[in-house]
């Protein structure tokens, strides 16, 4: 997982202060769900996803993604205190550097929904080889987290 902060990371001894996304440490001590492959609880969620934050995953094998089916992405997250959007980008998080937006998810502040879906549109030129995937967080409100981000699935629909 790759993540950036809109204002960088500041050290305030003995801690670090993040202005955007970071991976929250999760400890399994005294956890009744403890188990190596237990998906009932989120492990190491990406938190503090403020406007301008970018979270990326390298690399997805696009050769394994079916071309003859419609695609959706399921995002598991917890909405927080501000409305926002998550742009799903392939190749780069910036269109000026060759990135292509393949989906968009709107997140409503305080929503109790935990699964959000986005229809995906992947251009043929990016539908091959290994491609990096990025989630770009946007909001009209600066400095407030849009959501806690747990995981995602790419789904092929007939």
Predicted regions and their residues:
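Extracytoplasmic
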Residues: 1-158
């Amino acid at each position: 997982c790759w993540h950036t902060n809109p204002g960088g990371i500041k050290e305030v001894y003995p801690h670090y202060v993040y202005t955007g996304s970071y991976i929250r440490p999760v400890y399994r001590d005294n956890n009744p769900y403890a188990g190596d492959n237990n998906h009932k609880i989120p492990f190491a969620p990406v938190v503090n996803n403020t406007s301008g934050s970018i979270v990326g995953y390298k690399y997805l094998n696009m050769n394994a993604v079916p071309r003859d089916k419609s695609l959706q992405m399921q995002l598991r997250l917890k909405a927080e205190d501000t409305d926002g959007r998550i742009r799903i980008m392939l190749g780069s998080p910036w269109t000026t550097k060759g990135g292509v937006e393949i989906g968009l998810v709107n997140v409503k502040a305080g929503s109790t929904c935990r699964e959000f879906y986005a229809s995906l549109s992947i251009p043929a030129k990016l539908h091959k080889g290994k491609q990096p995937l990025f989630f770009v967080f946007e909001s009209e409100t600066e400095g407030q987290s849009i959501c806690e981000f747990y995981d995602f699935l790419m789904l092929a629909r007939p």
